[in-house]
UniProtKB/Swiss-Prot annotation:
Residues 114-330 form the DOG1 domain. GO terms for cellular component: nucleus. It is found in: Nucleus. Residues 1-48 are annotated as: Disordered. Residues 49-69 are annotated as: Basic motif. This is Transcription factor TGA2.2. Keywords: DNA-binding, Nucleus, Plant defense, Transcription, Transcription regulation. Residues 1-14 have a biased composition (Polar residues).
Amino acid sequence: MADASSRTDTSTVLDTDDKNQMVDGQSGAIVPSNSSDRSDRSDKPMDQKVLRRLAQNREAARKSRLRKKAYVQQLESSKLKLASLEQEINKARQQGIYISSSGDQTHAMSGNGAMTFDLEYARWLEEQNKQINELRTAVNAHASDSDLRLIVDGIMAHYDEIFRLKGVAAKADVFHILSGMWKTPAERCFLWLGGFRSSELLKLLVNQLEPLTEQQLLGLSNLQQSSQQAEDALSQGMEALQQSLADTLAGSLGPSGSSGNVANYMGQMAMAMGKLGTLENFLRQADNLRQQTLHQMQRILTIRQAARALLAIHDYFSRLRALSSLWLARPRE
């Protein structure tokens, strides 16, 4: 009986301990669970802010990548268009067609540009030869001053016409006019900005028009000096333009392929195109100087001296053309 009671007591104690442990276990399990729930509730607003911020950052990064991709694609597309335009220009020049910078075939190099001017210049030269022959006959026949004036005025108007034709042709192809491709090789050796130097022409005429009065000599000397100064200013302007253009083109040199280099290349070429646009202005100023010099020379001289001056100018350029013909026809070993 004592053993049974002892076992009962022991069992009761164990049961009680087990219950206590179970309660303690449950309590241990419940307490931490309640604490975690409170922590989750307090951290939830912060977690939502972080998530929103992360989502915003991801969206901003995605948009940035899309913008960069679109920018690179645009640059590559522009580079391809530029290369295609250059190919079109080269192809057109081989076929004799001038294409404007916008890609529109607004001028035909052979139809409305250089070749047309070459034909017009040939007709102009033929007409000038007729006028000069008429003037020479009148001078040799000792025609009256009034008759000489009519012929001289006609020749001066004819010079005005060639300057007008050059201005029109320069709008189609300024390089053709500036380079003197419409002139003979010997004439091109003495070419300055698409024509003759007024100052050099005046030097040539002074020796051909003697005797001259002191007032005429002074007038021609002043005209020669002012022409020389204007020519020097235009020459310096052309040199500055050429240097600026060279610097612009050199600035675009470098390894190709990256979007930055493509953008830089296109920007530099656009700047160079803008600077080339000033060539027409230089040519126009040079022709204005030539035209004004001829008219001022006529006002300084008597009508008979002006007639002799026009004959001397024509004979000088005729000899240059004849020299070119002889040079081209020379025997070659």
